[in-house]
Amino acid sequence: MTNAHYIGRFAPSPSGELHFGSLIAALGSYLRARSQHGIWRVRIEDIDPPREVPGAAETILRQLEHYGLHWDGDILWQSQRHDAYRDALAWLRQQNLSYYCTCPRARIQRIGGVYDGHCRTLQHGPENAAVRIKQFSPVMQFHDVLRGDIQADPLLAREDFIIHRRDGLFAYNLAVVVDDHFQGVTEIVRGADLIEPTVRQISLYQQFGWRAPDYIHLPLALNEQGAKLSKQNHAPALPEGDPRPVLIAALRFLGQNATAQWQDMHTDELLQYAVDNWTLTTVPESASVNPAFSNASC
């Protein structure tokens, strides 16, 4: 029986195929949702065309299916949500909660990399300008279900951050908040590399008058050099063969109790066993290398 009161999601960007680090986020969010008898949605965050790889979105969906991670409902494509983002921007403008900024990146770098509110009172128009939120009540900390209370960097928390870019693209923080609210997401399970923008996203929820979801930030998978596995670091794509060895490596990475039975289970049986025995308290907080996957991928 599905618990409609719990809605989780996995929201990859189509900048390349899924790799082991992506699988950690997908699997962790999937197991958390299914262990709560909840809904698990997939959203493709295709709002940054210069970073997108042709065909990557379709490949990602095939990879999820191949690894037994079957989602609920229709895929939400951010490229089809521009009207919703424009409406959100217009509402913030009407409420005097945003302003146009013409400051070049070089100026912000010269003052230390954190924006100082220079354009907040200058009444610029939209031409060749970004849109920034007016940070009246910054969020200085948030509670992570896995990690406890997390303190924000005060300078970043207080910054009037960009919600609409100068090049006309919608900023990630705006789009993710609007879409998570639209999809009714109650808990976000994702990688620890996204801890930093969380307070900004919660502040947007407050500006809109919406309830923020709960958050769980999973440990990051690192390569042998200690860098996060990522598309930018050329992490190898998930293997196309038998998914079970990689799923087992991912489950162990997430601190789940391995049993000898895992090796003999079919993919669906393995995932159902993992759902039935999912334990958040054994998930490690720190990032680590996964040598089993690294060796298998060479």
From Swiss-Prot:
Motif 'KMSKS' region at which residues? 228-232
Query: Which cofactor names does the annotation list?
Result: Zn(2+)
Annotated residues for binding of Zn(2+):
101, 103, 115, 119
Which sequence ranges form a coiled-coil region, renumbered to this chain? none
Q: Which GO terms describe its molecular function?
A: ATP binding; glutamate-tRNA ligase activity; zinc ion binding
Task: Spell out the GO cellular component terms annotated for this protein, sorted alphabetically and separated by semicolons.
Answer: cytosol
Assigned keywords, A-Z: Aminoacyl-tRNA synthetase, ATP-binding, Ligase, Metal-binding, Nucleotide-binding, Zinc
Alphabetical GO biological process terms: glutamyl-tRNA aminoacylation; tRNA modification
Xref: Pfam families: tRNA-synt_1c
The entry's L-glutamate-binding residues are 9-13, 45, 172, 190
Q: Which InterPro entries match?
A: Glu-Q_tRNA(Asp)_Synthase, Glu/Gln-tRNA-synth, Glu/Gln-tRNA-synth_Ib_cat-dom, GluQ/Sye, Rossmann-like_a/b/a_fold
- What top-level branch of life does the organism fall under? Bacteria
Report residues binding ATP.
Answer: 231
* EC number per UniProt: 6.1.1.-
Q: What is this protein called?
A: Glutamyl-Q tRNA(Asp) synthetase
Q: Which organism is it from?
A: Citrobacter koseri (strain ATCC BAA-895 / CDC 4225-83 / SGSC4696)
